[in-house]
């Protein structure tokens, strides 16, 4: 089915080639290349596949991307993680997967794509809810918002991305039936636009993380992360939401680029965050706000919302001014996503991170600013913040709005140093965007961090991630904790894990601010944490484990997404792999539903699997498992995984499965380094596919040429015969004609029509002339 193009750079990617027969083509591309019949089966199957896919994905089909593939290829590149067809995720399946609990919406493809992201974010947000049960439910509504975010997604514009060309050749050529999808492969820069494949979407929730992961591996994704969030805010302000998502998207890219690797992760959690929003109520709000931070953009747009919601969660307010009421809450969530970004920030990304945020920030300004996290961003934030800050005011109190936002930021901060800066930034941003760090402190102060810490355990794990979860519990305590966090935070930020911790903090942040909110916050934190955790994880593999833990917590939270994320982190080392894994996992969940989609999904898994195959399974099981616990994912994952990998029979029908298998096999065989296998296997598969495609083209051309030649030969034959006939007639006429007539010919030609006879004669002469021409033709 779809192979992941191993090479990002190649312009030509075969998104999906399905073989009805088996995955043979997939497993052994070479074979299929050689064997036309196979191709044919493939074609048929692909058609079916496509169709189903289309149905599944609906429009997304187009986008369907190969995000996973991309991811694979991206490895370094993180080309396009972004995918997301938010809609897809909508499937719900995803959502479920993501946060099943959460709310299906979560599904949203958080995909890495920022655009998608946005939507996903939303979705994620949706899913996040799980974490805050309260939030969760709300989440659902939230998700709707998120969906809205999708619009931002447009950036992704999957549709434009692919063109499906159906070759129907009259001849019975085996290849004839194939359905080819040409996807323009955008380079990473297009990241945001990266096509997202529904599959991605599917994955996205989990993908989210994985994306993040993947991204982190790739780095690209980072940005995506948050976007969604904003969207999720949708409710709050759809606009804001939307904007945020957009922002997120846009911002995404930069971060992606920069921190690429991490970024993605952030994304993931972002997703998780979102759900919290629902809680806006206060607690919920907090949550959301927590998330918000991450999502600066979201926050921003939503921010207002956030503010509204936040009020309940002052902290939320912090970020955006969450003060606003709960409405903002939702927003807050968005903020959540931000954190993810921070993740990316984690690395150097910080700078870039800012970018990511930057976009959103604007929206965010208020609280989200914090998200801006990156210093650059932070400055940006600063500005925003300034703007925001005003709103922040409420926050100020909290920690200074800035602080509070910062807190949110913290989340991001947690993400990585970048994140931390982000967080700080956020915090700072609001407060002192310029100084991400300082903000960080703020965040610490936000206590968000503390929350994470509260988790205490988690902190260890993720530093904050888990904490976050705990955070909620200890929302209040978080506050106390924060200092540590703070202290740690700074360091944390330096350390990926730390950042993560921070991230968790983020959620806390809100908590801190709204101390009262705290509880909510805690929830938020929980969610956030997840996210962060994953982030952290991704950043630091080591955290990874914690992440897992975190994940579970998160899971509870509904971080499902996060789980995925954390999963990614887990992989982190494998980073991509794990991401894939994560994706896979989630995907898996989705897989069922999206088996077709899965196809794409599978890809990531494939790579995942490839390197991680074993790992994947276990890891997936493990890390994902927790997260997966979300039932949907879990079971799906299990089924998918097992199916995917093991399942053969399915292959036919489910390319994805086949793909998994094939890829899996290849990967296993190759199973060099994660990436090696991923890229290696992917490359091989892609090369094979390309070869196959070239052969196909060659054969088509050959047929066409032969047909043309035959036609031309026949025509020449006819012309020659006609020419000879005319010559004979001409000779006959000449012999019969009198000299007078012949002498008149020239004149007649000059003045034809003088006599019918002459005309006849004249007519004849031209014929003679013609013959020569004809001969020429024939000779030609």
Swiss-Prot record:
Biased composition regions of type Acidic residues, renumbered to the chain: 28-37
One Pfam family cited in the UniProt record for this chain: TSC22
Annotated spans, Disordered: 20-86, 126-158, 235-499, 587-607, 736-780
GO biological process, one term: response to osmotic stress
Record field: transmembrane: none
Pro residues: compositionally biased ranges: 765-774
Compositional bias ranges of the Polar residues kind: 241-262, 415-434, 736-756
Note: May be involved in the loss of cell cycle regulation in colorectal tumors, expression is shown to be decreased in the majority of tumors.
Function field: Reduces the level of nuclear PKM isoform M2 which results in repression of cyclin CCND1 transcription and reduced cell growth.
Similarity remark: Belongs to the TSC-22/Dip/Bun family.
Quaternary structure and interacting proteins, as annotated: Interacts with NRBP1. Interacts with PKM isoform M2; the interaction results in reduced nuclear levels of PKM isoform M2, leading to repression of cyclin CCND1 transcription and reduced cell growth. Interacts with WDR77.
Protein name, as recorded: TSC22 domain family protein 2
Native organism: Homo sapiens (Human)
